[in-house]
Amino acid sequence: VGIKSNIEGIGLEELGVAVERDKVVVDEFYRTNVPGVYAIGDIVPGPALAHVASAEAVCCVESICGLDPAPVDYTTIPSCIFTQPEVASVGMTEQQAQERGIAYKAGRFPFTASGKATAS
């Protein structure tokens, strides 16, 4: 179950680009260990979502252009799970906020209260 990066046969080995567990290794600006080679999206660690790749692309290109962008803050990018009903989230988990000593409010919403969750 899951997504496998499509990195076979695209020349990464010949260039010497570092790969770990089916993902291209990059820094916070999506530079690989090979100068001039960058990677974003589904082939780097992180959520495999189009809007995540878009944020990574903006950061990467701004860095290439010398614009000194802030690294992508993945906690500010919405995430989703395409189930029925759908599940979405944004921000840190409760555990992450606790570990960082950040004041937070946690909410719960029971599926039984959602008409979409109980309709067949």
Tell where the protein language model's regions lie, with residue ranges.
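Mid-to-C-terminal Rossmann-like scaffold of FAD/NAD(P)H-dependent oxidoreductases
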Residues: 6, 43-120
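FAD-site-proximal beta/loop scaffold in flavoenzymes
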Residues: 1-68
